[in-house]
């Protein structure tokens, strides 16, 4: 029951968003919640790539090291050309939406809002964060969001404190990041979306092309053996064939309308022991003092030598 709460919440947010902007082109990071206990497979692949087949660049910025019980920013960058559009489920052109997933080490989590700085509050305005599940507060999801205004998504992260949690150790930790723009090519059910290039299942000749009332196209193809095959192309992709064209098996019948894609990367952060920092500072101070004393001693010796005429 606990695991259903964030899923239901995500579904509610999506439903409200659809009512506000029905023509949007969604990036669905929360779909993974409904199908996978863990969004990262044993191979290291984030499961969003199972539906978003195109590979695109995703970047991340995190501090090299952080102190215990401190708030820091993990920034996910989802670059693409401004004003890029793609097709929605009804075939119309719409702006790209973006989404992101950040898989933090155990103990790290979304920082409570009362610890956000004014800068973080400004940078996260309009962004809604959800946990992957009730049990996995270290896995955070964002999206869908309007892409042109959210090419950089800031995640406010709270680091754990080994002094209050004995399961946490100081050291280096991995962070797994995924960023998506646009709709996928495969639904979680395994069906293809209209955000695909469609190909001929067999070789033959196009005998007819009929437009459907919802924008789809029904293509009849006759093979050399006389078998007639029907290919239904949903609204959106542009047809590349016409009647009497001969096509080979696997030949494209449409253009590829997809302009989005998914990318992932791994980065690292060090949970730094403040005692080591204090020790390092003390060492630097000691070295600096030693150098100063050596310089003073050298000058003193030079004065004595000068006075003695050496």
Swiss-Prot record:
Compartments where found: Cellular thylakoid membrane
UniProt signal peptide: 1-23
Keyword Metal-binding: yes
InterPro entries noted in UniProt: Cyt-f_TM, Cyt_f, Cyt_f_lg_dom, Cyt_f_lg_dom_sf, Rudment_hybrid_motif
GO function term, MF aspect, one: iron ion binding
CC annotations in GO: plasma membrane-derived thylakoid membrane
Entries under PROSITE patterns matching the protein: CYTF (PS51010)
One BP term from GO: photosynthesis
Cofactor: heme
Keywords: Electron transport, Heme, Iron, Membrane, Metal-binding, Photosynthesis, Signal, Thylakoid, Transmembrane, Transmembrane helix, Transport
Free-text remark on how the cofactor is bound: Binds 1 heme group covalently.
Transmembrane parts of this sequence: 277-297
Transport among keywords: yes
Binding positions (heme): 28, 48, 51-52
Membrane topology: Single-pass membrane protein
Purpose: Component of the cytochrome b6-f complex, which mediates electron transfer between photosystem II (PSII) and photosystem I (PSI), cyclic electron flow around PSI, and state transitions.
Homology family: Belongs to the cytochrome f family.
Protein name: Cytochrome f
Organism: Prochlorococcus marinus (strain MIT 9303)
UniProt lineage: Bacteria, Bacillati, Cyanobacteriota, Cyanophyceae, Synechococcales
């Amino acid at each position: 029951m606990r695991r259903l709460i964030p899923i239901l919440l995500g579904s509610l947010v999506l439903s409200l968003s659809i009512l506000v902007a029905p023509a949007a082109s969604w990036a669905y990071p929360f779909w993974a919640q409904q199908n996978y206990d863990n969004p990262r497979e044993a191979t290291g692949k984030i499961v969003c790539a199972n539906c978003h087949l195109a590979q695109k660049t995703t970047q991340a910025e995190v501090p090299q090291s952080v102190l215990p019980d401190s708030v820091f920013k993990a920034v996910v960058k989802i670059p693409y050309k401004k004003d890029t559009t793609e097709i929605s489920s009804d075939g119309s052109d719409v702006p790209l939406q973006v989404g992101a997933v950040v898989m933090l080490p155990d103990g790290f989590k979304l920082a409570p809002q009362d610890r956000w700085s004014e800068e973080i509050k400004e940078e996260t305005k309009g962004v809604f964060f959800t946990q992957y599940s009730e049990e996995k507060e270290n896995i955070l999801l964002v999206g869908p969001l309007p892409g042109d205004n959210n090419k950089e998504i800031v995640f406010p992260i709270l680091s754990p404190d080994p002094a209050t949690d004995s399961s946490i150790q100081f050291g280096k930790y991995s962070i797994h990041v995924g960023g998506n723009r646009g709709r996928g090519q495969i639904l979680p059910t395994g069906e293809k979306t209209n955000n695909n290039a469609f190909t001929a299942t067999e070789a033959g000749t196009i005998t007819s092309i009929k437009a459907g009332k919802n924008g789809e196209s029904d293509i009849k193809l006759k093979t050399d053996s006389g078998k007639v095959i029907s290919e239904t192309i949903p609204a959106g992709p542009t047809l590349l064939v016409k009647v009497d064209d001969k096509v080979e098996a696997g030949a494209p019948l449409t253009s590829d309308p997809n302009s989005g894609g998914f990318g992932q990367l791994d980065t690292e952060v060090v949970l730094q022991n403040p005692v080591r920092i204090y020790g390092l500072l003390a060492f630097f101070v000691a070295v600096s003092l030693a150098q100063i004393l050596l310089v003073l001693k050298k000058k003193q010796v030079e004065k004595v030598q000068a006075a003695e005429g050496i």
